[in-house]
Amino acid sequence: MSDLTHLDESGRARMVDVGAKDDTLREAVARGEVRMRPETLQRLAAGDMPKGDVLATARIAGIMAAKRAPDLIPLCHPLLLTHVAVDARLDVATSTVQIEATVRTVGKTGVEMEALTAVSVAALTIYDMCKAIDREMQIGAIRLVRKSGGRSGDFVND
């Protein structure tokens, strides 16, 4: 269990002490998608959704979620985020909304959970705003695609 930093010697969950770590620039990029019927995607593209501007609302929800990650994930450190961007674009070929979140900070720990939370909540928002016309939607492929900064170095999973 020594590789699992969120567990103490007895195997109990604990918050990692990052106090002695140096502040460095940290960035994480996460992606995910919402798959829907082609007719739903067409209505989304046309702005013809009963609940309003779905993509704008999803972007704002994702940004808000990144800032609230420590409230949702028990051992996640509260961080001063210096940048959060959430993009949602329509992919007609796959009948999906592709979501990407980029999060940055200068701090002692990474922002992977914030980026993943942003994508997840943006996807849930899209689902919520479209479910009245498409209950078959699927949220998926949520993953960390890139991170930089910190002792563990860079990670790329594109």
Swiss-Prot record:
Which keywords does UniProt give here?
Lyase, Molybdenum cofactor biosynthesis
Quote the subunit structure annotation. Homohexamer; trimer of dimers.
Q: Identify the species of origin.
A: Roseiflexus sp. (strain RS-1)
UniProt xrefs under InterPro entries: MoaC, MoaC_bact/euk, MoaC_sf, MoCo_biosynth_MoaA/MoaC, Mopterin_CF_biosynth-C_dom
Gene of this entry: moaC
Q: What is its EC number?
A: 4.6.1.17
The positions flagged as active site in the entry are 128
* Catalytic activity, as annotated: (8S)-3',8-cyclo-7,8-dihydroguanosine 5'-triphosphate = cyclic pyranopterin phosphate + diphosphate
**Which family is this protein grouped under?**
Belongs to the MoaC family.
Which molecular-function annotations from GO does this UniProt entry contain?
cyclic pyranopterin monophosphate synthase activity
A GO BP entry: Mo-molybdopterin cofactor biosynthetic process
Q: In which pathway does it act?
A: Cofactor biosynthesis; molybdopterin biosynthesis
The answer, when asked if Cell membrane is one of the entry's keywords, is: no
What does the record give as the function of this protein? Catalyzes the conversion of (8S)-3',8-cyclo-7,8-dihydroguanosine 5'-triphosphate to cyclic pyranopterin monophosphate (cPMP).
Q: Does the keyword Lyase apply?
A: yes
> Which residues are listed for substrate binding in this entry?
75-77, 113-114
Q: What is this protein called?
A: Cyclic pyranopterin monophosphate synthase
Read off the CDD domains from this record: MoaC_PE (cd01420)
